Amino acid sequence: MRDYTKQYINGEWVESNSNETIEVINPATEEVIGKVAKGNKADVDKAVEAADDVYLEFRHTSVKERQALLDKIVKEYENRKDDIVQAITDELGAPLSLSERVHYQMGLNHFVAARDALDNYEFEERRGDDLVVKEAIGVSGLITPWNFPTNQTSLKLAAAFAAGSPVVLKPSEETPFAAVILAEIFDKVGVPKGVFNLVNGDGAGVGNPLSEHPKVRMMSFTGSGPTGSKIMEKAAKDFKKVSLELGGKSPYIVLDDVDIKEAAKATTGKVVNNTGQVCTAGTRVLVPNKIKDAFLAELKEQFSQVRVGNPREDGTQVGPIISKKQFDQVQNYINKGIEEGAELFYGGPGKPEGLEKGYFARPTIFINVDNQMTIAQEEIFGPVMSVITYNDLDEAIQIANDTKYGLAGYVIGKDKETLHKVARSIEAGTVEINEAGRKPDLPFGGYKQSGLGREWGDYGIEEFLEVKSIAGYFK
């Protein structure tokens, strides 16, 4: 049992103002594995005051000083690798190999990318007799999701530290352990008091007062659209800057000249990775009618090889859904797909055989899906694929963009000219060609209802900066 009932405020582990706690459940076993404080407004106020007190001092640190701080964080993060991997497997249910290869590594990559971005980032620019200055925005509130406990937290923290902005972090109450380890890392390497503050709790007790606090100048949130909308409403009262990374319903366009086995393997991975709990999951797979039958045969073969099971067993590729609530939501979407007339091609409702304990879902494929069906329009956040056929490229692009979301898109094929045309035509913040992968120095964010602003690398740093023009500075 992990007992993390203290908050980290102003460089110290302190008792929460609240006597309440939140239990953390291992989704693979349905057992309580720890608890964290259920913080309240008083905790938030104390954390914001600590951050505000150090704001001017931290803002005026040099780039070299902030790079040195990030260097120390990187080294200690690497020292805590096993602790981070174990915590994520416990709280999220991610297979150990995934926790190490993806979750741990992505968190590390963002600290490195922010440090490297500072090598060439210009905080000042001369324009004739005038000067343009970019300076830290001030106290920033960070609210992070449960599906990537280190990635989503590290990318925000790294950018804020690089910019010189102190923060108050509220991690997800479902996966808070990784954030506590990050706090321990920052404490050990000597992050200045007040620069980093951790307040555990739920949205009502911590998220709301953080979003409304008059001394918080910027809110950075990753999560659902409805919650993002509420944060914007609260932040609008005093015109805070807001950065949002929200949901997605990403298209994966398969071209007719593709290697079918390669395409089936790639699209399978994009749906089952992290048990489908990925905002960029390519869950709408668009396939040319002319290769549909061959593609589906290979797709079924690829899905049949996916091993769902105990995240601590060797060979497990897919772990459980995060919670009973989320498991039930995935089941409801699968049933909705059947009700609306989509053809169940693989998987379906219920749990995989032999996995009655834990929130395990069956990887599922629907075919003959109309893009207006619920399963093709709404984010499921589970291992559920919708296969949609198209007749020509224009139709594929039209279907791909027929969504309220625009976080990511994918295309796979051989003809470079066609690949480039599709990539430029998809309305999304990130498009991957032939499984190229996303590097941590590339900007990340969404079009339409997938969010506002950009994260990662120098673009992420800029979210935590204000721009000042000083006329006549060089006269």
Curated annotation (Swiss-Prot):
Amino-acid positions noted as binding NAD(+) in the UniProt annotation, renumbered to this chain: 146-147, 223-224, 246, 379
Keywords: NAD, Oxidoreductase
This protein's record includes keyword Oxidoreductase: yes
Cross-referenced InterPro entries: Ald_DH/histidinol_DH (IPR016161), Ald_DH_C (IPR016163), Ald_DH_CS_CYS (IPR016160), Ald_DH_CS_GLU (IPR029510), Ald_DH_N (IPR016162), Aldehyde_DH_dom (IPR015590), Aldehyde_DH_NAD(P) (IPR012394)
Catalytic residues (positions): 245, 279
Gene3D superfamilies: Aldehyde Dehydrogenase, Chain A, domain 1, Aldehyde Dehydrogenase, Chain A, domain 2
Swiss-Prot/TrEMBL GO biological process terms: aldehyde metabolic process
GO molecular function: aldehyde dehydrogenase (NAD+) activity
Annotated signal sequence range: none
Swiss-Prot/TrEMBL catalytic activity: an aldehyde + NAD(+) + H2O = a carboxylate + NADH + 2 H(+)
The EC number(s) this enzyme carries: 1.2.1.3
Family of the protein in this entry: Belongs to the aldehyde dehydrogenase family.
Subunit structure: Homodimer.
The protein, known as: Putative aldehyde dehydrogenase
Lineage, opening ranks: Bacteria, Bacillati, Bacillota, Bacilli, Bacillales
